[in-house]
C-alpha cells in the first residue's frame, strides 16, 4: 500500500508493522506525512501477504528487497515497529540495503545475547505458535495481550485490539512468528553501533522494557511522550514529529 505525495527525487519512507498487524496499522500517523511518499508493507502471513511464507530473517530481508525493486523504490528510509523493527534492523545489518538512507526502529529488540536465551525464546514462541494454530484466535489473543509489554493498554483498548487482530489467520501468523522468533534473530546490538547510515530508536516514554534495552545497549533513543510500546498508535502527533525531525536532520555519529 502506498500513501502520500510521490516526487521523483524524494526518498520513500518504508514502514514495517508488528506481529498480527498490517500496513493499515500506520493509519494514525498518515495525516502527518501527506507530503511524503510512503510504502506500507504487509509482512508475510499478514494482511494482503497472508498467503506468503518466509523461512527466516534472511529470506524476509530478500523479500523486502524484491518488494522495493517491484515498486521502483531506489532510495528510502526504513521504519519498523516491534517485529517490523527487528526485521528492519536485520535488513540494515545483514541484508542487501543499497539505497537505504537511514534506519528508524520503534520498540524492536536488538537480539538475545546468549545461546541459552535464544533457545529458551524459540521454545517460548513455539508454544504461542501452537496456540495460534489450535485455539480460537480471539481466545489466544486475550492471553497474548496480557503480556507485560502491553500493560499500558486499558481494557477497552485491549478488546478493540483483539477484535481487530482476530481477522488474522492464526496458522499464517504462527508460521511467521516461528520463522522470525527473537530466538532465531542474530544479536545485532554491536552491529547497530557501527552502521554507516543514520539510526534512531523510537520508544514510548512508558515502555519500561524497551527504554531499558535502549539504555543497556546505547541505542540512539528518542522517547515519545504519553505512549507505551505502540507509540505510533498511542500518540501519533508526537511520534510523527520525532520521525519528521529525524528525516529532515539526520545525524550519523
UniProtKB/Swiss-Prot annotation:
Residues 11-147 form the AB hydrolase-1 domain. GO terms for molecular function: 2-succinyl-6-hydroxy-2,4-cyclohexadiene-1-carboxylate synthase activity. Its EC number is 4.2.99.20. It is an enzyme of class 4 (lyase). One of its GO terms (biological process) is menaquinone biosynthetic process. Pfam families: Abhydrolase_1 (PF00561). Pathway: Quinol/quinone metabolism; 1,4-dihydroxy-2-naphthoate biosynthesis; 1,4-dihydroxy-2-naphthoate from chorismate: step 3/7; Quinol/quinone metabolism; menaquinone biosynthesis. Keywords: Lyase, Menaquinone biosynthesis. Gene3D superfamilies: alpha/beta hydrolase. It catalyses: 5-enolpyruvoyl-6-hydroxy-2-succinyl-cyclohex-3-ene-1-carboxylate = (1R,6R)-6-hydroxy-2-succinyl-cyclohexa-2,4-diene-1-carboxylate + pyruvate. Catalyzes a proton abstraction reaction that results in 2,5-elimination of pyruvate from 2-succinyl-5-enolpyruvyl-6-hydroxy-3-cyclohexene-1-carboxylate (SEPHCHC) and the formation of 2-succinyl-6-hydroxy-2,4-cyclohexadiene-1-carboxylate (SHCHC). Monomer. Belongs to the AB hydrolase superfamily. MenH family. This is 2-succinyl-6-hydroxy-2,4-cyclohexadiene-1-carboxylate synthase. The gene is menH.
